[in-house]
């Protein structure tokens, strides 16, 4: 399974929803980068994604986007192939 990295904050309901979905799909470990604790990480996230909002999710080297994009990818059947190593 691909590595999953998520930029998040503690109180973000979309972050919680995204983590729950990923765990339901078999992801055992999510590298959780808390941008509320480290302003440098928020700046890094914005430089990588061009976005200010959380969550920002990476599966392997693929930037999935936020929670809505993750859910949409799952609904169209494209999340599991990406988690299992397909290019996204």
List the predicted regions and their residue ranges.
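Conserved catalytic core of Hanks-type protein kinase domains
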Residues: 24, 48, 73
């Amino acid at each position: 399974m691909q590595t999953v990295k998520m930029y998040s904050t503690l109180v973000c309901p979309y972050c919680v929803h995204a983590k729950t979905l990923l765990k339901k799909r078999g992801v055992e470990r999510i590298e959780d980068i808390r941008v509320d604790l480290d302003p440098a990480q928020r700046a890094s996230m914005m430089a990588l994604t061009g976005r200010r909002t959380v969550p920002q999710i990476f599966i392997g080297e693929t930037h999935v986007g936020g929670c809505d994009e993750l859910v949409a990818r799952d609904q169209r059947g494209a999340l599991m192939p990406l988690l299992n190593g397909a290019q996204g």
